[in-house]
Amino acid sequence: MTQRPLGGSREPPLGSRIVKRKFDPAELELMDRPQPVSPELEQDLRSIRQLNRWFGSHRIVRCFVRRWIKPGVRMRIVDLATGSGDIPRLIVDHARQIGARVEIVALDQQSATLEIGRKLSSDYPEISFIEADILEFKPPDGYDIVLCSLALHHFSDEDAVRVLWRCRELAHKFVLVSDLCRGWLATIGVNVLTALIFRAPMTRFDARLSAERAFSFAELDDLARRGGWQNFCHKKFRFVRQAIWLEKTAKL
C-alpha cells in the first residue's frame, strides 16, 4: 500500500533497537489498579489529557479523522482504552464543525476513570461510555472506525497481538493504533518531563513505566503481522510516537 505523507517517516527512531522492553504482568500502572475516584486519579487523567494535546496523540488522531470523516457522513466509532474520553470529544468536535454525524463508544475497564470521563463529556451525547475489557468486548455489530491510542504497551506481546486482532475484526472501514515508540529518546524525554513538569507521583510512575513497556518500531510491525494485519501502513511521528493503520482499500 502506498504511504501517504502525514508528517512522519518510516525509519525507526535512534536507539529503539538498543533499549530492551521491560514488561512484568504483575506490575500494573497505578491508573490501571482498582480504585475509586480520587484527586490523585483526576490529576493523573488531567496530565494525560495535557500530554495527549501537547505531545502528539491528538495530532495523530486529527490527521486521520480529517481524512476519514467527511461532511455529511454518518459513522460509528469505538475508542478502545479511552481513559477520560478526550479523543472521542476531539472527534465529536471535528464532526460537529463539518456537519458529520458520529456515534462513539468510549470503552475502558477502569470504572473510576469512566466516571470521570462521563462527567467531562456531559455536553457530548454522541459519546457512550462502556466498562469492558478490550479482549472480552463483543458488540453485536462492528464499527466504521476503531481507535486504540496509548494502550498497547499495557499488554504482553501475546495479548497485544490479540488486541490488534480484535481491532481488525471490529472495523468495517478503518483502524488506527498509536502508541509510544520505545528508545532512548522516549526514556530521556519522559524522565525530564516527569521531573520538571508532570511531577505528580501517579503520573511520574506510570509515564516512566510506559516508556519501558512501549514497543519498538520493529516490534509493533511484527505484532501487527502476527495479528493478521495485511497491507497496513506504519510510521513514526513527532515526540517518539508511532502509528499503524488500515484503510478500506486494504484487506481487513
Locations of regions flagged by a protein language model:
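C-terminal alpha-helical "lid/dimerization" subdomain adjacent to the S-adenosyl-L-methionine
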Residues: 180-227
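Class I SAM-dependent methyltransferase Rossmann-like catalytic core
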Residues: 34, 38-68
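Conserved beta-strand signature within the Rossmann-like core of class I S-adenosyl-L-methionine
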Residues: 171-180
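N-terminal, positively charged/glycine-rich alpha-helical extensions of SAM-dependent methyltransferases
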Residues: 13-46
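Conserved Class I S-adenosyl-L-methionine
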Residues: 213, 217-248, 252
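A short, conserved alpha-helix within the catalytic core of class I
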Residues: 155-166
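Class I SAM-dependent methyltransferase SAM/SAH-binding core
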Residues: 78, 84-86, 90-136
